[in-house]
């Protein structure tokens, strides 16, 4: 069984036991978070599509890590004008371990 869950403005396909990197959440390492914006539930014999969300469905996940992605370097350059600008960006993320998927009855 799998579900498509929305968090941080993005959609992720998850199943029990999977690890997923999502946009940074305000939670400490070891905390459990509940993701209740479930868009789709896929079972072996049926698919439940939410309008926009599946009522009563939620995903319980554990925060494994709060970290940053590797640095992305941005370099701006204008020829003949001696204009150069270099800066970097590291996007923070939260790594979740999916513990349980709760479905409506």
UniProtKB/Swiss-Prot annotation:
One of its GO terms (cellular component) is cytoplasm. The keyword Ribonucleoprotein applies. Part of the 50S ribosomal subunit. Contacts protein L20. This protein binds to 23S rRNA in the presence of protein L20. GO terms for biological process: translation. Belongs to the bacterial ribosomal protein bL21 family. Disulfide bonds: none annotated. This is Large ribosomal subunit protein bL21. It comes from the Bacteria. Keywords: Ribonucleoprotein, Ribosomal protein, RNA-binding, rRNA-binding. Pfam families: Ribosomal_L21p (PF00829). GO terms for molecular function: rRNA binding; structural constituent of ribosome. The gene is rplU. It comes from Dictyoglomus turgidum (strain DSM 6724 / Z-1310).
């Amino acid at each position: 069984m799998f579900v498509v869950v929305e968090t941080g403005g993005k959609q992720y396909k998850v199943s029990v036991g999977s690890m997923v990197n999502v946009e940074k959440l305000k939670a400490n390492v070891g905390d459990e978070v509940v993701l209740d914006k479930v868009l789709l539930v896929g079972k072996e014999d049926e698919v439940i599509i939410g309008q926009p969300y599946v009522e009563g469905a939620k995903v319980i996940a554990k925060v494994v890590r709060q970290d940053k992605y590797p640095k992305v370097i941005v370099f701006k350059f204008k020829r003949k004008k001696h204009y150069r600008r270099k800066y970097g960006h590291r996007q923070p993320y939260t790594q979740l371990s999916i513990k349980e998927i709760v479905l409506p009855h």
